[in-house]
Regions:
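Conserved non-catalytic scaffold segment of RNase H-like nuclease domains
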Residues: 3-186, 200-217, 311-314, 322
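Acidic two-metal-ion nuclease catalytic site recognized across multiple nuclease folds
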Residues: 2-69, 236-345
């Protein structure tokens, strides 16, 4: 770790003194001066410093030829989405801000080509916003008074969208589906749960932290700027696959996910189930785990037979299948049962 002292150095070389004078001359320079990016570039080259750039949203289109140099783009359209709400319960609380950025994406390169539309509006929930939520997003009753979002524009933006992406989609999706049922007919992905950030050497999936990894900072907890930050984060190339994060989400949306319920698992296996990332559901008194592909599902069933059920007769598990249309929603997937005695190792 580099320790920076507030005390000035005891002596400077002639070149250092000249540089110090030049730096002092920078005081009062306007923020848009071309000198600042140059200084940031030089400081970034020093191993003891990491320079963060303020996120600047832009709607400037980029041509396909710039982005996809060797082949014609295979264009898909997506939306990154964020909400601010009056609370955590989608049944009793309301959306008071919706932010969406609609973009075009080249599935052959994993690159975002173009931002084509932006939506950010407020809505009066019809009751006072709780102080504890105002403290998070700073949206007050006065800001939303008498306002209603443009439903027609929301639905219009969704018309030709292949995928909706949210950072913690299991929170945002139930809220927006309650308010705009058209969201129910779209495929969804979650940039927290559908990307293994730890496998890629990133210790936190918090959006502000991921943005810093990408070299940017921003004022968080308002819907539109959170969307811009997420779009930048999704351009990140993941070390484990050498794919962009957004490419990983689009590809995972083409595959089913499976929730495995370890029905009647012996009590003495609870610790190894927990170590394997199974979660206990007290309402149904069962351990369960989500796996992301049919290959992983088969591996999981083999593991359960070997380490949990052994040679027990009649051992079976319940499997709930989710496509991207049901994923991260408050709806059940397609349920079936698998008799583990039929499973060949």
């Amino acid at each position: 770790m580099t320790t920076i002292s507030n005390s000035p150095p005891t002596s400077l070389s002639v070149d250092e003194e000249r540089l110090a004078q030049d730096l002092k001359a920078l005081e009062g320079l306007p923020p848009d001066s071309a000198i600042w990016p140059l200084l940031a570039k030089h400081l970034s080259a020093h191993p003891g410093f990491k320079v963060l750039k303020q996120l600047t949203p832009t709607l400037t289109p980029r041509s396909y030829k710039e982005q996809a140099l060797q082949k014609e783009p295979q264009v898909l359209r997506g939306i990154v989405l964020d909400t601010e709400t009056t609370g955590m319960n989608h049944l009793s609380d309301k959306v008071i801000e919706l932010g969406m950025i609609k973009f075009e994406y080249d599935s052959s390169t994993g690159q975002v080509l173009n931002v084509i539309d932006v939506f950010d509006e407020l809505e009066d929930p019809g009751f006072p916003i709780p102080p504890e939520t105002i403290a998070v997003h700073h949206i007050t009753d006065e800001m939303v008074k008498g306002k209603r979002m443009d439903d027609q524009r929301v639905n219009s933006m969704l018309q030709d969208v292949d995928l909706v992406i949210a950072h913690n989609a299991s929170f945002d999706r139930p809220f927006v589906e309650n308010r705009w049922p058209h969201f129910c007919s779209k495929r969804w992905a979650c940039s927290i749960k559908d990307i293994d950030w730890r496998q890629n050497g990133i210790g936190s999936a918090k959006l502000e932290y991921l943005a810093m990894v990408q070299g940017i900072f921003y004022e968080a907890h308002r819907a539109e700027i959170d969307c811009w930050a997420l779009l930048e984060v999704l351009k990140m190339v993941l070390p484990s696959s050498q794919q962009t994060a957004i490419q990983t989400l689009f590809e995972s949306a083409n595959s089913d996910q499976f929730k495995v319920y370890a029905l009647g698992s012996p009590f003495e296996t609870k610790d190894i189930l927990k170590q394997r990332a199974y979660r206990w559901s007290p309402d149904i008194k069962c351990w369960s785990k989500v796996v992301g592909s049919s290959e992983r599902l088969n591996d999981e069933l083999i593991w359960l037979k070997q380490h949990v059920y052994g040679s027990r007769k009649g051992a079976k598990v319940e499997i709930e299948t989710f496509s991207a249309f049901e994923r991260h929603a408050e709806r059940d997937g397609l349920k079936s049962f698998k008799d583990l005695s039929d499973l060949s190792l």
